[in-house]
Amino acid sequence: MARVVPAWLLLPLAVWVVLPTWLSSAKFSSLIERISDPKDLKKLLRTRNNVLVLYSKSEAAAESHLKLLSTVAQAVKGQGTICWVDCGDAESRKLCKKMKVDLSAKDKKVELFHYQDGAFHTEYNRAVTFKSIVAFLKDPKGPPLWEEDPGAKDVVHIDNEKDFRRLLKKEEKPILMMFYAPWCSVCKRIMPHFQKAATQLRGQFVLAGMNVYPSEFENIKEEYSVRGYPTICYFEKGRFLFQYDSYGSTAEDIVEWLKNPQPPQPQVPETPWADEGGSVYHLSDEDFDQFVKEHSSVLVMFHAPWCGHCKKMKPEFESAAEVLHGEGDSSGVLAAVDATVNKALAERFHIAEFPTLKYFKNGEKYAVPALRTKKSFIEWMRNPESPPPPDPAWEEQQTSVLHLSGDNFRETLKRKKHALVMFYAPWCPHCKKAIPHFTAAADAFKDDRKIACAAIDCVKENNKDLCQQEAVKAYPTFHYYHYGKFVEKYDTNPTELGFTSFIRTLREGDHERLGKKKEEL
């Protein structure tokens, strides 16, 4: 006869089965490091320079955050590290106290702290979403995502080309799309007005925004002629009609324009500066060399007709030229070159931004301080400062960067397991900005003979064929090579943090593979 077990005897078993459900659901990615020992955290912060730590009141309190951070960890692998400390655990309480984590308030279950370069950086107080945390870890000091602004809830935020194409295909309402870059000051100025207009026009129009600064959006930028930021395009039934170019608009201006969208009015062509007359000499590719030979002291302004800073400086430059003209040739003369027309001169003197000033003394070119006003032009021309000695070329400086040429490029990289190569031009502003970061990354791995940070000056004649073979179309360009074979283009983050994180991921991958081989043996 079967024995009947009282129901109350089964209760402890039921409770035992139910209790671990939240514990089992708190499983998290192996990419998240659980830490309880202060020494382990100290070591981690010393060896990783971009760390986000989740401190929780208990394991249960961390459940939803761990689930989210597991997906984030995968997305930022090689660029950032995520850790978890359970402050409710007896072993971890000492660590939480030492790190000044206070979770005593009833409604406070977790804290997210960010550490950079071994030190506390900031408390994470942005949106707790996948996109926001990923964006933060990829650029901890960068601006928040536009969509994090509560006022931008009526703007449609597009993340990728697939979503962009889907919007154009399926949306019946007219679309005003802002292509922008997060760092762009003009974009930041117009964004509040754009989002206010989106709210006012909700249900009638779609106002959307898309960060197209990353290189993955080159096709979109080419298709819609995105030459600067912001570029605002108007669509009807998925078809691009024209651009909206009033970047100083208010929300009311945008709303009013959308009532009757019209293409930009053709601008009345400006009179070329050279045709206006005045005391500034306007030089060309043909007469430049002869002019600087005939005049012992010449200050030349390289400009572009569309350049706002040039237009602002032009009257100051012209007024100074009039004063100097009255003094005869004793104080020198001021001259100008339209770099958009006289391209040979612009290339010869590596003109990469406008306006650029060059000073010529008896035909020789010298460096010029930052002159912008009538007074500074006159004072400097009356008594030109002795030109400071030029900074040594990058390849002449003592660094850990390997400066290669077309002759030794292949042979050198064949001996390196991991090589990150920077193709650059010495005059390029973006290259100048990246060089100290790349140099610091090279120094960080100088003791590892399998790793190299190398550089190629694409301006040098004997390197031009190599740069062309490696499909270098812009400066700087970064390529990763494995024993001399091209693997991928690096275009994520041209900073010391970005470079070192990328290389460290490659090295950690080597260690993982070595560990697996040892286990197999």
From Swiss-Prot:
One of its GO terms (biological process) is protein folding. One of its GO terms (cellular component) is endoplasmic reticulum. Its EC number is 5.3.4.1. It catalyses: Catalyzes the rearrangement of -S-S- bonds in proteins. It is found in: Endoplasmic reticulum lumen. This is Protein disulfide-isomerase A5. Pfam families: Thioredoxin. It comes from the Eukaryota. A motif (Prevents secretion from ER) lies at residues 518-521. Residues 1-25 form the signal peptide. Belongs to the protein disulfide isomerase family. Disulfide bonds join C184-C187, C307-C310, C428-C431. It comes from Bos taurus. Keywords: Disulfide bond, Endoplasmic reticulum, Isomerase, Redox-active center, Repeat, Signal.
